[in-house]
């Protein structure tokens, strides 16, 4: 096995630890040795620790840090970060770099499946609910990007994360810095609530905008708390008018939205984006095991319906297979994994805690999930 990110990836995490990709799992030893301010980014891919990981993969042995991709690929899915990188960066030369950078974590949403380091609002609400102590959230911002200048000509692609890139002030600073210094393709993940249209129009190089959409309409306004669906949908439609912008969509599948994924699929089937990816939260209490047996048939039926629609629509074959495999893996899990009452109660308490501090009620937005929690 080989991973392009071990040759070309530079991902700067919340705590300014450098790693090959966004899903790289690291321990305290890696964090100590790979702090942004103490390594040479220009030669980092030739370091002993990175070469050791390359050699292990070459022996078809999965490093523990690659757990995320292993869990996806073992199910037969072809949309892991590693496999996506093999396709996306196939033409990279030895010096080309993909930079993933998170200048800040300020966000105007508090999505139910998000985590404190990625959203200041999530951190605030979870702190209010007593789930975390906000003082323990290690999410550092970056406001000066000139440290990238020594190898700026090697940066071929940038993945910009937040917070919300069009809301966080340091992300906006990076966009302005990029317009002045970079000739790279820029990919950014957005909640779709606000787009800086002047930057979209004026950036002289290719742009990829990844909309995070987990549901449509009223359920979206609960699951991705902060959403005004009409605004997100309008921006989703508007971005497709720009020829230099590639549209992608990421769907995070969880117990919150298994039943609502069909609505997102129906929306996308009108004009399937270049890439549709499916994310999975890391917490077991957001997964299939929390779904009571009596609620599973309805979800399976809706997902199977979506699978058949995808199969019968003329979509690029690889994308079609990835979408089918992602949904089929949920169906298989619902049909084989036993219900876990302890996890169900943990999910129920999490929902209650979030509803309390956000002053909302899931019953008003997601009746199926509310009824599922009442079982």
Positions of PLM-derived features:
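Short, intrinsically disordered, charge-biased short linear motifs at domain edges
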Residues: 8-11, 46-59, 96-102
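Membrane-interface junctions of multi-pass transporters
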Residues: 25-68
């Amino acid at each position: 096995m080989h991973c392009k990110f071990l040759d070309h990836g530079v991902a700067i995490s919340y705590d300014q630890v450098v790693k090959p990709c966004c899903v790289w799992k690291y321990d305290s030893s890696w964090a100590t040795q790979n702090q942004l301010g103490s390594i040479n980014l220009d030669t980092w891919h030739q370091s002993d620790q990175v070469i050791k990981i390359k050699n292990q993969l070459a022996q078809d042995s999965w490093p523990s840090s690659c757990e995320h991709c292993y869990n996806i690929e073992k199910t037969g899915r072809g949309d892991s970060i590693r496999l996506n990188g093999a396709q996306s960066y196939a033409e990279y030369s030895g010096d080309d770099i993909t930079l993933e950078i998170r200048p800040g974590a300020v966000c105007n949403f508090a999505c139910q499946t998000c985590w404190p380091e990625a959203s200041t609002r999530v951190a605030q609400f979870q702190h209010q609910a007593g789930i975390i102590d906000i003082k323990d959230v290690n999410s550092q911002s970056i406001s000066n990007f000139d440290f990238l200048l020594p190898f700026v000509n090697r940066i071929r692609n940038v993945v910009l994360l937040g917070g919300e890139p069009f809301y966080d002030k340091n992300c906006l600073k990076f966009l302005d810095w990029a317009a002045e210094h970079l000739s790279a393709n820029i990919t950014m993940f957005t909640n779709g609530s606000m787009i800086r249209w002047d930057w979209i129009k004026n950036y002289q190089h290719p742009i990829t905008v990844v909309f995070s959409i987990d549901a449509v309409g009223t359920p979206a306004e609960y699951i991705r708390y902060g959403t005004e669906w009409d605004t997100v949908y309008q921006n989703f439609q508007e971005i497709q008018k720009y020829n230099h912008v590639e549209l992608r969509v990421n769907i995070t599948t969880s117990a919150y939205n298994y039943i609502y994924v069909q609505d997102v699929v129906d929306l996308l089937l009108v004009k399937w984006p270049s890439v549709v990816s499916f994310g999975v939260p890391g917490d077991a209490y957001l997964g299939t095991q929390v779904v009571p047996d009596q609620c599973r048939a309805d979800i399976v039926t809706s997902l199977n319906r979506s699978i058949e629609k995808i199969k019968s629509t003329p979509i690029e074959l690889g994308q079609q297979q990835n979408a089918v495999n992602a949904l089929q893996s949920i169906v298989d899990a619902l049909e084989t994994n036993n219900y876990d009452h302890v996890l169900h109660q943990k999910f129920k308490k999490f929902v209650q805690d979030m509803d309390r501090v956000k002053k909302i009620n899931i019953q008003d937005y997601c009746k199926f999930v509310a009824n599922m929690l009442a079982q």
